[in-house]
A protein has these predicted regions:
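Extracellular beta-strand/loop-rich repeat segments of large surface/secreted proteins
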Residues: 1-70, 112
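Extracellular/surface-exposed low-complexity segments
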Residues: 29, 33-35, 54-173
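Residue-level detector of buried hydrophobic side-chain packing
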Residues: 30, 49-50, 71-75, 108, ...
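Primarily extracellular Gram-negative trimeric autotransporter adhesin
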Residues: 110-119, 226, 445-456
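Outer membrane beta-barrel translocator domains of Type V secretion systems
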Residues: 143-371, 469, 478-480, 492-516
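Flexible, solvent-exposed loop segments that connect beta-strands
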Residues: 252-254, 294-296, 340-344, 394-405, ...
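Outer membrane beta-barrel transmembrane domains
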Residues: 382, 391, 401-516
Length: 516
């Protein structure tokens, strides 16, 4: 591409001059600087022929522009203008450029587009763009005027994504995932009990000493000598560790970017068998998680603490389980902002609280060493994020592009419909191996994740931005096994995967349990 421009000189009419004819081919670009006062570069052709083609490009200089600015005679000639540029463009995403062709000259017209009204904007770009437009005026002064003057030079609408803070919404999915992982440690203990790994009362047949029916009258004389029933363990203490990773795709029309997060942590708890059909327990744990939204140059960390209680009631082959958990997170975020003046780094720190619970019902069907259990569950969580303001820096100086975030409440409400397949193999000496496979369809009724923010140093109204959402529908698969070493010790492990059109997540968990 051949480009004709002269950025090293002051704006002035006629600063390009050709004494001969002027011809621009289809591959050529005539790039002329223009400013908000009407000054512009221009070309004077003294020859007898002007042949136009290619691109006429307006290179927008810093300043506050009105709706329309006309630049007269950006190309003038003593000859006639009988051809046209193939295209007329602007270096800024927020201007449309057109040309007017006269007998001996070409004029350039620059029309400013509202920050929230540019063709092709996403939902998020329109949201912050409309807020910025409401605060714009050619009469602005000081730092606000400088901000808008630099913004108007941006060559891509992506600058609005950089300003929006959209990537910080990644704290929400990350917090929900950490809470779910803690809940799965409690769920695992209830599942172990439901599947029958807790020991039981021994019968005569189990002892192998005599038939269940007496063989003669003398048998009654020895009835009192029957082996006593083995007491079922009533207490469990357990500890578990977990780790997980998730990838979620963004939404192009909304304007959200892809999110990835990682989490690891552990929990410990104790439960009590109130009666042969009722289990009650409590647990506490901690987690550490990170997230990254690469396309928004945003990352963060969440340090969480969790406490919860759980219960399961059996009604013959039916069961009902419930759990409730509270989590507190210390959140930190970091993002890099480019495209408006000097690159800035913005950091935020805030606390958040989460309350969640799960209710599940199911019925087991026994097929010898295998049981099949259809089940349905609902899992609700509410996350409250505190308000906070970023501290931004531009090199060693304070920044001007940081955001102030409003307090936010976000809900997750997935439901589960599926089946559990539990095996059971006894090896003797109270050692039992129990492999299992659980499969479910998961539907999330509240997948949206949003933030509401405003610029700290620029007086504009708040705007709401949507981040990467949770998947509305996904398939979940659990694979694992439990090994009861004897009546007092059990180890277990499982891996879980969720798969959807937006991405996938994987988690792993291991646990050790002592019973007495």
């Amino acid at each position: 591409m051949i480009t004709i421009t002269d950025p090293g000189t002051a704006l002035a009419v006629g600063n390009f001059g050709f004494s001969t004819s002027f011809t621009q081919t289809a591959q050529g670009t005539l790039a002329l600087r223009v400013d908000n006062t009407g000054l512009h570069d221009s070309v004077w052709v003294g020859g007898t022929q002007v042949n136009l083609n290619g691109t006429l490009r307006a290179v927008v200089q810093a300043g506050l522009y009105g709706t329309t600015t006309t630049y007269k005679d950006v190309l003038a000639t003593s000859a006639s203008v009988n051809s046209r540029f193939a295209s007329v463009t602007s270096s800024s995403a927020f201007f449309n450029a057109t040309a007017t062709y006269n007998a001996n000259s070409v004029d350039l017209i620059l029309t400013r587009q509202g920050f929230g009204a540019v063709a092709g904007e996403t939902q998020n770009q329109r949201a912050i763009g409309n807020a910025l437009e409401a605060g714009y005026s050619t009469a602005l002064t000081g730092a606000t005027a400088t901000f808008y003057a630099q913004l108007l030079q941006a060559g891509s609408l992506r600058v609005l994504d950089q300003l929006s803070g959209e990537g910080t919404s990644g704290t929400q999915n990350t917090a929900f995932n950490s809470g779910v992982l803690f809940g799965q440690t409690m769920e695992g203990q209830m599942e172990a009990w439901r599947a029958g790994n807790r020991g039981g009362v021994a019968s005569d047949a189990a002892l192998g000493y005599a038939a269940e029916q007496p063989r003669g009258p003398a048998a009654s004389a020895f009835a009192a000598l029957k082996a006593p029933a083995m007491a079922q363990p009533r207490w469990n203490a357990w500890a578990a560790g977990f780790g997980a990773g998730q990838q979620l795709a963004g939404n192009a029309s909304v304007g959200s970017a892809s999110l990835s997060n990682r989490a690891a942590g552990g929990a410990m708890g104790v439960d009590y068998l109130v009666n042969p059909d009722l289990l009650l327990g409590m647990a506490a744990g901690g987690s550490s998680a990170t997230f990254s939204v690469d396309d928004r140059a945003t990352s963060g960390r969440l340090e969480g603490g969790h406490v919860g209680v759980y219960a399961m009631q059996r009604f013959g082959a039916n069961y009902l389980s419930a759990q409730i958990a509270y989590s507190h997170f210390n959140n930190t975020t970091t993002r890099t902002i480019t495209g408006v003046g000097t690159t800035e780094a913005a950091q935020g720190s805030f606390g958040s609280d989460q309350l969640g619970g799960r209710l599940e019902i199911g019925r087991s069907f026994d097929f010898g060493i295998t049981a099949v259990t259809p089940f349905a569950a609902i899992q609700a969580a509410r996350l409250w994020q505190g308000a906070y303001t970023e501290a931004s820096t531009a090199g060693a100086a304070p920044g001007v592009l940081g955001l102030s975030y409003a307090a936010q409440s976000v809900t997750s409400l997935p439901t589960f419909l599926g089946a559990k397949f539990d095996g059971r193999v006894a090896f003797g000496n109270d050692m039992v191996w129990s492999p299992f496979v659980h499969a479910a369809w998961v539907h999330e009724f509240r997948p949206s994740r949003t933030i509401t923010a405003s610029l700290v140093t620029v007086p504009v109204s708040a705007f709401t931005i949507a981040g990467a959402s949770a998947a509305s529908d996904s398939a979940r698969l659990d694979l694992g096994s439990r090994l009861a070493l004897n009546r007092w010790w059990e180890v277990s492990a499982r891996v879980t995967g969720e798969f959807s059109n937006l991405g996938q997540s994987y988690s792993g968990m291991g646990a050790l349990k002592a019973s007495w």
